[in-house]
């Protein structure tokens, strides 16, 4: 705003009169906020629908927080001098450092966890990246990892975090589940999956002691055992759910969807898991299903040497082998029915337990290259009918009253002879 003043003297008689003229100019105030136009940051409220990641400055233990929907990224706030072990190829970012000089404080190394036992038990990953710093820092971990393979696996994975306080152990049955863990007193080990149930469970359920657990596979014969105190980040296929079983409560679950469960020691799986097969036909009575093998022929010959007793013994042996053959066929039929309806994949879990259930199982396939296309349309070699060149001769016939008629002929000689004969 500017102002100007102009004075004018007017003399009236002996009186002087002063007249003033004032001009005022008004300009519109700027509507924008004046500031540094070269700034590289903006206000937090200008960024919508994105979770703000804040680094932890004062921590005693690591903090795990799953992000996203599905939860495919894990944010970790790490205290100083506490190592973090993560699967190689899963690290997305390191942030929360005060200045560029603090990056030098982060130390990285490779740690191998029982590679021979993991190879024998069918557990894939044995190498983990170890990160440690003398100052607090934060990490972003992906649920997937970069690894060369001819088999294309599903990338629909999500995180679940577990805090171990030393009172409960965990058995992780999915071999690719352990993605990241930390804790100075946390123990990660491998054990073989039990094939049969314990005698204690067989007496409780009143079933034979040689009943299988349903968890054992020749290509996946081991599981990861977690004990002690620490933080663990597990990944599973699809969404992950928690199921709590009370005392003596039972649950049927597909073993391919069982991510892990709580146990009391590394040998407690045989006390809570048993294979379950759905009944597909009416079972026979126990008395008729048991086949007793007759005495040997040599024993009968020593006791009775008559032809009648020899015939009875031979007939008894024939009945025994015939019944054994029918029993084998019935067992094969039961196994075939169970395989067709998928019963062989179900196991029964007996509480009290905590279960982690993944909504989908691991699938893999060989990725085949797609054919090359030009401009989005596949070019195909299409051959049409071949056209041969030929000479065509035409002549015109003018007939009074009929007009002009055009005709074609391969040879003028035949046409001329025909016209002359007319």
Curated annotation (Swiss-Prot):
Pfam families: AIM24
The keyword Cell membrane is annotated on this UniProt entry: no
GO biological process, one term: inner mitochondrial membrane organization
Keyword Glycosyltransferase set for record: no
Domain of life: Eukaryota
InterPro entries, per the entry: AIM24, AIM24_sf
Presequence positions on this chain: 1-23
One cellular component term from this protein's GO annotations in UniProt: mitochondrial inner membrane
Keyword terms of this UniProt record: Mitochondrion, Transit peptide
Compartment(s): Mitochondrion
Family according to the record: Belongs to the AIM24 family.
Protein name: Altered inheritance of mitochondria protein 24, mitochondrial
Organism expressing this protein natively: Scheffersomyces stipitis (strain ATCC 58785 / CBS 6054 / NBRC 10063 / NRRL Y-11545)
Protein's gene: AIM24
């Amino acid at each position: 705003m500017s102002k100007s003043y102009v004075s004018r003297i007017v003399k009236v008689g002996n009186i002087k009169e002063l007249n003033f003229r004032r001009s005022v100019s008004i300009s519109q105030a700027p509507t924008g906020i004046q500031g540094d136009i070269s700034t590289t940051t903006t206000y937090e409220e200008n960024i919508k629908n994105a979770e703000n990641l804040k680094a932890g400055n004062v921590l005693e233990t690591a903090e795990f927080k799953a992000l996203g929907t599905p939860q495919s990224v894990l944010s970790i706030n790490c205290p100083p001098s506490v190592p973090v072990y993560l699967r190689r190829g899963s690290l997305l970012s390191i942030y929360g450092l005060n200045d560029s000089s603090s990056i030098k404080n982060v130390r990285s190394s490779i740690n191998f966890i029982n590679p021979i036992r993991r190879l024998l038990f069918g557990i894939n990953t044995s190498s983990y990246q170890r990160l440690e710093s003398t100052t607090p820092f934060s990490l972003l971990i992906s649920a997937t990892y970069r690894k060369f393979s001819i088999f294309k696996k599903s990338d629909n994975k999500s995180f679940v975090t577990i805090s171990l306080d030393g009172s409960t152990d965990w058995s992780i049955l999915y071999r690719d589940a352990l993605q990241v863990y930390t804790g100075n007193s946390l123990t990660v080990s491998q054990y073989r999956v039990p094939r049969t149930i314990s005698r204690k469970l067989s007496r409780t359920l009143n079933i034979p002691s040689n009943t299988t657990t349903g968890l054992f596979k020749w290509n996946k014969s081991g599981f990861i055992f977690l004990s002690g105190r620490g933080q663990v980040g597990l990944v599973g296929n699809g969404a992950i759910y928690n199921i709590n079983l009370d005392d003596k409560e039972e649950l049927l679950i597909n073993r391919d969807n069982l991510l892990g469960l709580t146990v009391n020691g590394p040998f407690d799986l045989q006390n809570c898991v048993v294979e379950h097969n759905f009944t597909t036909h009416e079972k026979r009575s126990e008395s008729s299903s048991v086949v007793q093998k007759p005495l040997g022929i040599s024993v009968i010959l020593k006791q009775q040497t008559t032809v009648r007793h020899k015939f009875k013994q031979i007939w008894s042996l024939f009945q025994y082998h015939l019944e054994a053959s029918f029993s084998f066929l019935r067992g094969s039929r039961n196994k075939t029915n169970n395989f067709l309806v998928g019963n062989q994949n179900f196991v029964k879990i007996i509480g009290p337990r905590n279960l982690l259930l993944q909504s989908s199982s691991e699938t893999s396939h060989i990725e085949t290259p797609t054919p090359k296309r030009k401009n989005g349309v596949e070019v195909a070699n299409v051959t049409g009918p071949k056209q041969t060149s030929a000479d065509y001769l035409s002549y015109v016939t003018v007939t009074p009253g009929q007009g002009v008629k055009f005709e074609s002929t391969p040879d003028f000689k035949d046409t001329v002879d025909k016209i002359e004969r007319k």
